[in-house]
Amino acid sequence: MPHDILTSGTEDRTPAAGYCAIPILPDIYFSVRLRCTVAGVPHCHEGVMPSIFTVANPKGGSGKTTVAIVLAGEFAKHAYSVVIIDADPQGSSYQWHASSLARGLSPDGIDLVRAADAGALSQAVERLDSYDVLVIDTPGYYGEVLIQSALRADLVVLPCKVHTFDASQVVRTIRNLERHSTDAGLPMSRYRVIFNEYDSLDRNTRPLREVVAYLDAEHVPVCAHALYRRVTYRTMTSGHGTLYQMSDKDESVRKARYNADQVVRELLAATQGTTPTPTIA
């Protein structure tokens, strides 16, 4: 089955310096869900709840923290209150936040808390319900924290590099989460795979075709937009705040912002069960 990513031209259609993103959808709140306390997952709030995005992949080096920071930065840019819950013992999101503060680049509109285990995660989610958006950066291994993070999510975002090893790990993760969801008596959270560190040279190559065909065969939804391999993203995660605290005089920063905007719009649409109008050919 053909997939947009196979012929995607996101990089080639990046706007010029005058580009200004149309505001993200005005209401990111997910409709009320009433969930019973099952398997230690209390989720029975009435009223408005924050939208929860869980970034998960047990394989190290998949780019979870980059995706988490991009998500948080895009929502914060549109004036939503955001908190990143760093549930990874490596603390990469925490290091980014602390390094940014040390440089005087406090990530505007983004707070950060750490959650060392499943209990701390549960307490954090309940305590932070006044925020608009919660982004959970999960550990690089499959365990209780990742499971609980996924069961709570409006959307599970699974970063994946264009390689069959990475794709097979993503599929195993999804199947395990489906099993745990069934065991807990909870509906499976929506999820999307996003190709990370994507290179325009990957387009129309055999590895990309094989990975996309494999994920299609497994009925795994893949984002039409990918996060490109960019020095700008590496600079950002090294403690330079968000993309919107970097100089827009730099064309590479403008391109990264446009790329991030397109990705987050698609992920946001996925939480609502909709597909945005294609912007690439």
Enumerate the predicted regions with their spans.
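Conserved C-terminal guanine-recognition region of P-loop GTPase G domains, centered on the G4
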Residues: 170-185
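G-domain G4 guanine-recognition motif of GTPases
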Residues: 161, 191-206, 226-236
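Conserved ATPase-coupling elements of RecA-like P-loop NTPase cores
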Residues: 95-96, 143-149, 167-170
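Inter-lobe coupling/hinge region of RecA-like P-loop helicase motors
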Residues: 235-257, 261
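P-loop/Walker-type NTP enzyme "switch/lid" segment
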Residues: 45-48, 52-62, 69-136, 140-144, ...
